[in-house]
Amino acid sequence: MMSHQQVQMDLILMQGIWHSVLNMQNQSILLQLGSSSSMPQRPRLLSRVSQRGRQILNLESGRWRLSIIIFLETGTIQLTATILPSTDCQDI
């Protein structure tokens, strides 16, 4: 489990889908990240940024980049997922 100040995060695989469990002071949130078929590697935490009542968790899994923004005052969550382009060369 990864923790910092008021937010603890754990990554789990349930029924083929990666989830983030976010534990804040008085609540827990289960956040679906993506399927293990498209995201075969366990997501790993790249960075954690605290700024003005928010925590931003940046994760990666292969070509996937995920940003979880936690608004500490309200307990609301925003998830942004980006898939990087493939670097494999293909003959045309």
Swiss-Prot record:
Annotated Pfam families: Bunya_NS-S (PF01104)
Domain of life of the native organism: Viruses
Keyword entries, A-Z: Eukaryotic host gene expression shutoff by virus, Eukaryotic host transcription shutoff by virus, Host gene expression shutoff by virus, Host-virus interaction, Inhibition of eukaryotic host transcription initiation by virus
GO biological process: symbiont-mediated suppression of host gene expression; viral process
Keyword Oxidoreductase recorded: no
Transferase in keyword set: no
InterPro entries per UniProt: Bunya_NSs (IPR000797)
Family membership: Belongs to the orthobunyavirus NS-S protein family.
Protein's job: Inhibits host transcriptional machinery, by producing modifications to the phosphorylation state of the C-terminal domain (CTD) of RNA polymerase II. Inhibits phosphorylation at serine 2 in the heptapeptide repeat (YSPTSPS) of the CTD of RNA polymerase II, suggesting that the elongation step of transcription and/or 3'-end processing is prevented. Inhibition of host transcription machinery leads to shut off of host cell protein synthesis and inhibition of the host innate immune response. NSs also seems to be involved in the nuclear relocalization of host PABP1.
Record protein name field: Non-structural protein NS-S
Species lineage: Viruses, Riboviria, Orthornavirae, Negarnaviricota, Polyploviricotina
Gene assigned in the entry: N
